[in-house]
Amino acid sequence: VNQTEIDIYTEGKPEEATYYGAKLEPRSGIYAGIVSDGNGNPEDGSPETFHHDFGVYSSYLEFDDFQTQLNKPSSYIVPEKNCISQVPWNVVDINLVLDSANDEYIKETLDNMAKYNKPTIIRFGAEMNIGYLGDSPTAYIKAFRKIADMVHEYPNFAVMWSPNDNGSLDRPFGYFYPGDEYVD
């Protein structure tokens, strides 16, 4: 559904919402954005769906493919906009993250994201409590902490922890929480 207006409902006033002071956390309100990977591509002539600015542009990276750059059109859109870049960094084989042989890949990817000079939220290993990432909370936590430590070396980057709230009953998302110091 292509809608240009949305309604947002809150309990109470936005200025009364709890504020934790985390990196890139809005003082009140929310960030609204789109996954920009499917929002047209100037190289293949596909049309732009959304013709106005958003506060957040999201573009997926695939760790297992050793992808180091944003997909198009995000690689065109993000530099042009006054926005936050949100990067869902998916991983299937958590052991790839733990393997120090891939540390240079992680650093190269983060360096590439830093070149956009935008506030950036890295959403690593999302929905870990369902599917293929749900088999080892210990390995997931270790990998998340490794990524978070590397992300926190960048002054305008933050880390998002994003479980699936409908996870399996035998894999509650609390088992995967890496700790407050790793999550912004």
Language-model segments: residues:
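Receiver (REC) domain switch/active-site residues of two-component response regulators
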Residues: 55, 183-184
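Generic detector of short, locally flexible boundary/turn motifs and exposed helical patches
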Residues: 17-23, 88-89, 150-152
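Active-site cleft segment of glycoside hydrolase catalytic domains centered on the general acid/base Glu
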Residues: 101-183
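Short low-complexity stretches enriched in small and charged residues
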Residues: 9-13, 42-45, 77-80, 140-144
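N-terminal carbohydrate-binding/catalytic regions of secreted carbohydrate-active enzymes
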Residues: 24-119
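N-terminal low-complexity, Pro/Thr/Ser-rich intrinsically disordered segments
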Residues: 2-31
